[in-house]
Amino acid sequence: MRHFIVLLILLCCLDGYSQKVAIRLNTLPAIDGAFGGGISYAIGNQSTIELAGSLRPWKRSEMYVNRYWLIQPEYKYWTCQKFNGFFWGAYLNGAQFNIGGKRLPFGVFSRLKERRYEGWLVGGGISGGYHWMLNDHWNIETALGVGYDFIRYKQYNCVRECAGLRNKGRHHYVGPSKASISLVYLF
């Protein structure tokens, strides 16, 4: 009987880990043939930290180059409880890219169609989103973020990898810098 009481006391003292860790698959990078996902950890009843990223290691043809990696740590404050409802966040991002021969939506970086850019970026911003609970483990989350990115790049005359260097430059970008529609699994 004494062993049972000691075991019961020990079990009551253990911290429960239900719904503290989540893994996510961001479906938006998949549209472009990239892998996107991340892991989140609850650090309180209304706070989580996340490490997300995206990777596209290949190109499609000589006239179309689109290789990059992105890493994006984020802090999220949930208005109700973690992994449920609305949240606000602050994030950092870093990336390396080699892209050209591509037309982006809304006329953003319109010169990408004729030229190739190779370089890196660092920045950060603020985000907001919503998390829908489907059941105890599966959820869907959407998020949008705006921020600042410092971009350092080399611009090449055309899309081909053998193209001559046109110039080097820097760009200060302010605008949308995060978008996600994620399938989330809670442990």
Predicted regions and their residues:
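Short, surface-exposed coil-to-beta transition loops
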Residues: G33-G36, G125
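Sec-dependent N-terminal signal peptides
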Residues: H3-L14
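Gram-negative (and chloroplast) outer-membrane scaffold detector with strong preference
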Residues: Y41-T142, S180-Y185
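Short strand-turn segments of transmembrane beta-barrel domains in outer membranes
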Residues: A22-A30
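Short secondary-structure capping/turn segments at boundaries of alpha-helices and beta-strands
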Residues: R24, G36-G38, K76
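Predominantly the C-terminal beta-signal and adjacent terminal strand-loop region
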Residues: N135-F187
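Boundary of Sec targeting at the N-terminus
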Residues: S18-Q19
